[in-house]
Regions:
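Short, well-ordered secondary-structure micro-motifs
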Residues: 16, 43-47, 90-94, 120-121, ...
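Glycine-rich, Arg-bearing micro-motifs that act as flexible, cationic patches
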Residues: 107-128, 146-147
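Short, structured coil segments at secondary-structure junctions
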Residues: 27, 125, 132-134
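Short, solvent-exposed amphipathic alpha-helices that sit
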Residues: 19, 57-70, 95
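Small/aliphatic-rich secondary-structure junction motif
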Residues: 2-47, 162
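Intrinsically disordered or low-complexity boundary/linker segments at protein termini
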Residues: 1-14, 132-162
Length: 162
């Protein structure tokens, strides 16, 4: 079982990676974190805080920086990055979907505060990734989930046939 986490270093991407790590530990699953780095848009990398204002833009440097962020949250996760010719959300989501086709995840963990909206903005990377029916999608909206009562492992479930 593999979990895929599109990762851009944002608060909600951190939350999605942390959540995937929790589920992976419980289910003995592998995690693949993927970052899409636009080659044409140095400003995008600066906006994501992948590159300092006085630092030269270099895809390898950005990939190394983001990989360290991933390892800090999910040391067991595999990391891969993809280059994109543009920073458009559509292109980034296309790259993520391509990786999903290669990795064949059971679940994609998306950190997004708008992926679950009934009307998904065209500019939403998460919305474009979430529409694929080849995998389940776990949308993470908060770093810590609300309190969930412990589930008894008695094996008795509502509606269970005996």
């Amino acid at each position: 079982m593999t979990f895929l986490v599109p990762y851009d270093g944002s608060y909600l991407a951190d939350a999605a990676l942390a959540r995937a790590t929790e589920y992976a530990a419980a289910l003995d699953a592998d995690i693949v974190a993927v970052t899409v780095i636009p080659e044409d848009d140095e400003g995008y990398s600066r906006d994501k805080n992948w590159v300092e204002a006085d630092e030269a833009f270099d895809v390898q440097t950005v990939a190394s920086f983001v990989h360290k962020q991933v390892v800090n949250i999910a040391p067991e996760a595999s990391f891969r990055y993809e280059r994109s010719p543009t920073s458009s959300p559509e292109r980034i989501s296309t790259e993520i979907q391509r990786v999903a086709d290669e990795e064949v995840p059971s679940v994609v963990f998306l950190g997004s505060d708008n992926a679950g909206q009934i009307v998904t903005p065209v500019t939403s990377v998460a919305g474009n990734v979430a529409k694929d029916a080849e995998y389940d999608v776990h949308i993470v909206r908060y770093f810590s989930p609300t309190e969930i009562q412990e589930i008894e492992s008695s094996g008795d479930y509502p509606g269970e046939m005996r």
